[in-house]
C-alpha cells in the first residue's frame, strides 16, 4: 500500500510496482545497454538496480550492458513490462 504522500502524487497503484526479474538468454534486453533497451520510452519503466553475482549496482549508467542471468530491478507497470519482455 501507498503512504499518504505517495498517494498525493496521483500515480495509480499499478503504475508504481517494483519488479525483480532474472534476465533469460532470450530476453529482448539481454546483451543490450540500458540506452539500447530504452524501457523508459518503450514501456514507461526505469531500471533502478542490477545484481550480477555478488555485485549490486544501484542506478546503473545508461551504457551498462545487461547479461542473461542478471537480476534486474524495474519500476513501472508490471503488465507492460512483462508483455514487452515476453515478446520475441
Protein language model regions, located:
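Cytosolic regulatory regions of ion transport systems
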Residues: 1-88
Amino acid at each position: 500500500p501507498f503512504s499518504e504522500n505517495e498517494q498525493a502524487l496521483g500515480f495509480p497503484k499499478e503504475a508504481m510496482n517494483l519488479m525483480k526479474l532474472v534476465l533469460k538468454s532470450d530476453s529482448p534486453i539481454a546483451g543490450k545497454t540500458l540506452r539500447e533497451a530504452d524501457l523508459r520510452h518503450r514501456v514507461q519503466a526505469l531500471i533502478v538496480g542490477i545484481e550480477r553475482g555478488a555485485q549490486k549496482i544501484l542506478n546503473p549508467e545508461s551504457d551498462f550492458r545487461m547479461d542473461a542471468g542478471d537480476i534486474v530491478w524495474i519500476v513501472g507497470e508490471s503488465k507492460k513490462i512483462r508483455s514487452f519482455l515476453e515478446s520475441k
